[in-house]
Amino acid sequence: MGEADLLFQLDGDADVMKYITLGIPRTMDEVIEKSMPRILKSYQDKTDFGIFAAYLINSDEYIGWFQFEKDKEFEDSIEIGWRLKKQYWGNGYATEVAIVLCELGIKMGKTIVARAMIENLASIRVMEKAGLKFEKKFWYPHSSSPDVLYKR
């Protein structure tokens, strides 16, 4: 299975996309045109930053991806994020990796930031478990409700 197929398992699922595209799943063409270039760029840059595929250790089952990228808004900050297939929600994977990513970024001397729609209580809880603290509420132009920024 190719990378676009794996990503389509996430982006083609309305439940996974609920707090990203207001629940509108992406088509395979949209995955190839919009999602893949961003992910492939992180591999081509060959840095410690990017969006990285996540697999279960015991089975090599693809479960989603994790983000560890230089933040575009705050200098010397790293944004963390995650997108998991819904059958892997609630297993602690997002929290486990978020904690590791926070520790890695802090060792690099960076501030860690994460963002989520205010209704995305599961992601907000992951941020809190990873030690991030509420910083502010803000609005993206395309959003129907506010987002929140957490920092550590």
Where are these regions (language model features)?
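A short linear-motif detector with a strong N-terminal bias
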Residues: 30-34, 47, 92, 128-131
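Acyl-donor (CoA/ACP) binding surface of acyl/acetyltransferases
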Residues: 1-6, 10-18, 53-152
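Short solvent-exposed loop/turn micro-motifs enriched in small/polar/acidic residues
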Residues: 45-47, 143
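Short, basic and Ser/Thr-rich N-terminal targeting/leader segments
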Residues: 47-48, 62
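Conserved GNAT-fold acetyl-CoA-binding loop/helix
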Residues: 15-39, 48-50
